[in-house]
């Protein structure tokens, strides 16, 4: 079969995802594949949990080096000469948006890029569940009874202290199926399948930063 191949095929490269757990990694994978359809089949994951946002100095450097080494290792397993086109490292800040978020995101991402050259630190505020609250219709598509109360709609969800509690106690309630962290990939699949990602109801700076990073990665790392 002849014809021009995609950037990933030509350069024998993969995108690597690291995160706190499997649910977060799978959620990120779903979102990345929507933004960059050429990545389907070209994403691999690191299973080790991520603990970066509180690290500084030599400790941060050491932890990032461990992730970078593992990323390069899983890339090599895809075939001789395969390189890491880009690394996405996800972690929840477990705190609301503010100066700490900006400083932490910058500090960790700079270290990732210093060691690898092409990487993005996906630091969710306050956690990835805050992203889900931007898409009430997607949550209802997963479980019809799940409803986001009006007081949480159209807001900056990065300012919510405990989005997970909101989902567990107020969105899914006490009757029927209750939200758990294992529902995250299904929720984000509903976000994509319903096209809700194009018009979030409210705002979240970390969500916007993530999509800006994906667009930048597509231009600079995957199709350069």
Give the ranges of each region predicted by the language model.
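Short hydrophobic beta-strand that contains or immediately precedes a catalytic carboxylate
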Residues: 17-19
């Amino acid at each position: 079969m002849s014809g021009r191949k995609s950037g990933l095929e030509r350069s024998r490269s993969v995108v690597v995802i690291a995160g706190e757990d499997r649910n977060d990694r799978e959620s990120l994978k779903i979102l990345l594949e929507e933004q960059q359809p050429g990545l389907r089949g070209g994403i691999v994951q690191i299973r080790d949990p991520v603990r970066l946002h509180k690290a500084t100095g030599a400790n941060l450097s050491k932890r990032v080096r461990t992730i970078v080494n593992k990323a390069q290792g899983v890339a090599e397993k895809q075939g001789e000469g395969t390189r890491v086109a880009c690394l996405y490292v996800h972690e929840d800040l477990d705190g609301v948006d503010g100066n700490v978020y900006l400083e932490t995101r910058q500090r960790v991402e700079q270290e990732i890029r210093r060691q690898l050259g092409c990487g993005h630190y996906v630091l969710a505020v306050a956690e990835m569940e805050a992203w889900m609250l931007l898409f009430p219709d997607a949550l209802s598509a997963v479980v019809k009874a799940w409803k986001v109360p009006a007081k949480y709609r159209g807001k900056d969800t990065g300012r919510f202290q405990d989005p997970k509690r909101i989902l567990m106690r107020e969105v899914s309630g006490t009757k029927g199926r209750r939200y758990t962290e294992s529902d995250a990939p299904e929720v984000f699949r509903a976000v994509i399948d319903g096209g809700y990602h194009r018009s979030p109801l409210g705002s979240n700076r970390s969500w916007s930063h993530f999509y800006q990073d994906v667009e930048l990665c597509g231009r600079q790392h995957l199709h350069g």
